[in-house]
C-alpha cells in the first residue's frame, strides 16, 4: 500500500486537485507529465541504493520523507503561489516514491524465500489495488465531501493531503517496529560506485544490442500512445462543466466513477488477461489484447458528444474502458518480461520499465494543450487515430508461440 498511494497521488490525484483549483488543462498535463521522470530514470540510480544502508532503512526513511512531501503540499495550497510550491513538493514525493519502490522490492526479496515470495505475490498485488482504490477513490471522495461541506476547495485538499501525511508518518513508525532485519539485507561489500557504473554501462550496451531491440523499444514507447494522452485528460473531462465540453461531475462523483468503478474494471480485466495468457500464450492473445486496450477508447468519443446527465451510463463506459485496458495491458507486461530474458534479466527489465514510463510521459505532456486547442470531441477522436500506431508497432513483434503458456 505504501508503494501505491504516493504513485496515485502524483499521477492521478494531482490532476484532479489542480483542476479543482483552477489550473488549465495545458498546465496540468505538462507539469504533472514531468512527474513521470523519476520512474523513467529510476534504473540509473537503483544500483547505488544497494551500496548505502539496508533496504529496510531505505524503505522506512522514504516513507517518512513522503510524509514530509505530503505535508508540504497541504501547507502550500492556501497560499497565492500554491502551484509552484505544491509542484516542488510533488517532485519530492515522486523521487522519494521511486526510491521507495526500489527499496521495498529489494526488501521483499531479502525478507522472503522463493516459496514465500510466490505465496505472497497475489496478496501484494491485492493490497496495491486496495491502495489504488483508497487513493483514487476514497481520498478523492473525501476531498469532494470537504469541498461541498465547507465551500473552501484549497482547505479541503489541504486536509486530504494532511491525512495522507499523517498516514505515512504512522506507516513509517509501524514499519520501524514490525519489519524484520534479514541477515542478507546489508550494503554490498567490496563494490564501489565506479564498479557499479561500469556494470551498468555493460548492461546498457547489452540491452541495446539484443535481437529486435529497436522494435521492442518502439513497442514500449508507443503501445500505450492513446492511453498516455487520455490518462491526463479523463479527470479534467469529467470535472469540466457541460458548457465547456465536459461531463460536469463533482469531485466526489469522479472519485467514485474513475477511482472505484474504474479500478474494479481494471483489476478484473488484468486478472482475466493473466488467465487467458497462461492458457494460450502471449502470441495467441496479442491481437485480442491490442483490440482490448484500444477499441474501448471509443467510449470517450461517445461521452464527449452525448454528455449524458446520469452517472449510470458514465459508470458503464468507464468500466468498459478500464476493463479493456487491464486486459490489454497484460500483453504489454508479458512482452517486457519476454524481451528481458537472458543475461542481465533483472537490469534489462528495469530498463524496460523506464521506457514504459517515458512512453506515458512524453505524449501526456502535450495532451492538455492539444485538448484545449481542438476541444474534447476532436481530442478523443485523435486518440482513436493514435490507436493505429499501437496496431502498427505490434505488427512487427516476433514472439515465441510457447512463451506465457502454462507448462
What is each of the regions a protein language model found here?
Residues 284-332:
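C-terminal transmembrane helical hairpin of 12-TM major facilitator-type secondary transporters
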Residues 23, 74-77, 81-85, 99-100, ...:
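Intracellular loop-helix junctions on the cytosolic face of multi-pass helical membrane proteins
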Residues 98-112, 327-341:
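Intracellular juxtamembrane helix-capping segments at the cytosolic ends
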Residues 1-39, 214-219, 223-243:
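Helix-loop boundary and gating motifs at the non-cytosolic
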Residues 47, 134-155, 274-275, 362-378:
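Transmembrane alpha-helix termini and helix-breaking/packing motifs in multi-pass membrane transporters
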Residues 41-54, 268-285, 371-372:
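Helix-to-loop junctions at the C-terminal end of transmembrane segments
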Residues 60, 64-81, 291-309:
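C-terminal ends and interior cores of transmembrane alpha-helices
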Residues 51-65, 278-292, 311:
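Cytoplasmic membrane-interface "Motif A"-like loop-to-helix N-cap segments
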Amino acid at each position: 500500500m505504501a508503494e501505491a498511494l504516493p504513485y496515485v497521488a502524483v499521477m492521478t490525484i494531482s490532476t484532479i486537485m489542480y483542476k479543482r483549483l483552477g489550473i488549465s488543462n495545458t498546465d496540468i498535463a505538462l507539469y504533472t507529465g514531468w512527474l513521470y521522470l523519476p520512474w523513467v530514470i529510476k534504473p540509473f540510480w537503483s544500483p547505488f541504493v544497494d551500496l548505502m544502508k539496508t533496504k529496510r532503512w531505505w524503505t522506512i526513511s522514504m516513507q517518512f520523507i513522503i510524509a514530509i512531501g505530503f505535508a508540504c503540499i497541504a501547507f502550500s495550497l492556501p497560499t497565492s503561489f500554491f502551484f509552484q510550491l505544491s509542484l516542488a513538493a510533488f517532485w519530492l514525493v515522486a523521487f522519494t516514491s521511486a526510491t521507495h519502490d526500489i527499496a521495498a522490492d529489494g526488501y521483499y526479496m531479502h525478507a522472503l524465500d522463493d516459496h514465500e515470495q510466490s505465496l505472497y505475490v497475489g496478496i501484494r498485488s491485492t493490497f496495491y489495488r486496495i491502495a489504488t482504490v483508497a487513493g483514487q477513490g476514497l481520498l478523492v471522495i473525501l476531498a469532494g465531501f470537504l469541498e461541498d461541506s465547507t465551500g473552501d476547495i484549497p482547505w479541503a485538499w489541504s486536509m486530504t493531503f494532511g491525512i495522507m501525511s499523517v498516514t505515512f508518518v504512522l506507516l513509517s513508525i509501524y514499519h520501524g517496529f514490525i519489519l524484520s532485519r534479514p541477515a542478507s539485507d546489508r550494503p554490498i561489500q567490496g563494490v564501489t560506485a565506479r564498479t557499479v557504473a561500469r556494470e551498468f554501462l555493460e548492461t546498457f550496451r547489452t540491452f541495446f544490442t539484443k535481437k529486435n531491440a529497436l522494435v521492442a523499444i518502439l513497442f514500449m514507447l508507443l503501445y500505450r500512445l492513446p492511453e498516455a494522452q487520455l490518462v491526463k485528460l479523463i479527470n479534467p473531462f469529467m470535472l469540466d462543466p457541460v458548457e465547456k465540453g465536459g461531463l460536469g461531475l463533482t469531485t466526489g462523483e469522479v472519485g467514485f466513477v474513475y477511482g472505484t468503478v474504474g479500478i474494479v474494471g481494471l483489476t478484473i480485466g488484468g486478472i482475466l488477461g493473466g488467465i487467458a495468457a497462461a492458457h494460450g500464450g502471449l502470441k495467441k492473445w496479442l491481437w485480442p489484447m491490442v483490440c482490448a486496450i484500444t477499441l474501448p477508447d471509443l467510449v470517450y468519443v461517445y461521452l464527449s458528444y452525448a454528455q449524458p446527465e446520469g452517472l449510470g451510463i458514465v459508470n458503464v463506459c468507464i468500466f468498459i474502458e478500464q476493463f479493456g485496458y487491464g486486459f490489454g495491458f497484460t500483453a504489454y507486461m508479458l512482452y517486457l518480461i519476454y524481451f528481458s530474458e537472458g543475461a542481465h534479466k533483472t537490469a534489462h527489465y528495469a530498463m524496460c520499465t523506464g521506457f514504459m514510463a517515458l512512453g506515458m510521459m512524453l505524449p501526456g505532456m502535450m495532451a492538455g494543450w492539444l485538448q484545449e486547442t481542438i476541444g474534447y470531441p476532436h481530442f478523443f477522436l485523435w486518440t482513436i487515430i493514435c490507436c493505429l500506431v499501437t496496431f502498427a508497432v505490434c505488427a512487427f513483434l516476433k514472439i515465441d508461440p510457447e512463451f506465457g503458456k502454462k507448462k
